Amino acid sequence: MFKSGFVTIVGRPNVGKSTLLNYIMGEKLSIVSNKPQTTRNNIQTILTGEDYQIVFVDTPGIHKPKHKLGEYMVNSAKDSTNDVDLVLFLTNPDEEIGKGDKFILESLKDKKCPVYLVLNKIDESTPERVAKSLEMYSSEFNFKEIVPIAAIKGKNVDTLVDLMKTELPEGPKYYPEDMITDVPERFVVSEIVREKALRCLRDEVPHGIAVDIIQMKQSDNGTYHIEVDLICEKDSHKGIIIGKNGQMLKKIGETSRYELERFLRTKVNVKIWVKVRKEWRDNQNLLKELGYKKK
């Protein structure tokens, strides 16, 4: 009997949703950064076994939106909990239950599918904090399963996957077994570049960064030639991104190239230009051009 179903991962920004998904898949398919709100789109990722197929939906964190891009992200996260077979509510033990957590849990109360509490980052906490957190969340919601994990190290992740399999109904193979994501290669490439920019810039430039793939061609010898526009909101941000004597932009390019070669499994040449598009996060037309469709 073949089993298949859809699992969505929800939680506040920066609790480790993308890290968990990347560990399960063994591929960097979702952007990972130490900054919150780095995932901006729902990404369907497919895990296929001999007798099962799990389609994961990795979502943006749910937060109070401050601009049209934020509205898009929150609506994407809410929409992803409809018509799924299982919801994983991800959080970590070192933070109190906040308004964001309660907002998410309240939105899940009318769901017919089971909801798991997945307590991430237990390796960074203490047994006392973990126990207190489990008690707090259990008093807020009737979770079917509670699974403490350390996604970055893979601790208890296999146990979580085994539990997920038990929730799958009998069903078809929705995607070919060699397909691991429903997003095009260009999208993953843009997310890799955006992640590296966020990591290199740290707190120097806020989340007003987008990536537009201008060209992506593969030559006869297999080498990819990629040209990218890195879009920011202010002229001052452009200067920071380029850096003194172009050193910051060079660093972003080098770290991006390394990760792109791992993902594409071939040599990559990448060129990055920095462009200013003022208030692009509130520009509906530009958001659409960059792939953020209005919900």
Curated annotation (Swiss-Prot):
InterPro entries: G_ERA_dom, GTP-bd, GTPase_Era-like, KH_dom-like_a/b, KH_dom_type_2, KH_sf_prok-type, P-loop_NTPase, Small_GTP-bd. An essential GTPase that binds both GDP and GTP, with rapid nucleotide exchange. Plays a role in 16S rRNA processing and 30S ribosomal subunit biogenesis and possibly also in cell cycle regulation and energy metabolism. GTP binds at residues 11-18, 58-62, 120-123. Belongs to the TRAFAC class TrmE-Era-EngA-EngB-Septin-like GTPase superfamily. Era GTPase family. Residues 3-170 form the Era-type G domain. Residues 11-18 are annotated as: G1. GO terms for cellular component: cytosol; plasma membrane. This is GTPase Era. It comes from the Bacteria. Residues 37-41 are annotated as: G2. The lineage of its organism: Bacteria, Bacillati, Bacillota, Clostridia, Eubacteriales. Monomer. Keywords: Cell membrane, Cytoplasm, GTP-binding, Membrane, Nucleotide-binding, Ribosome biogenesis, RNA-binding, rRNA-binding.
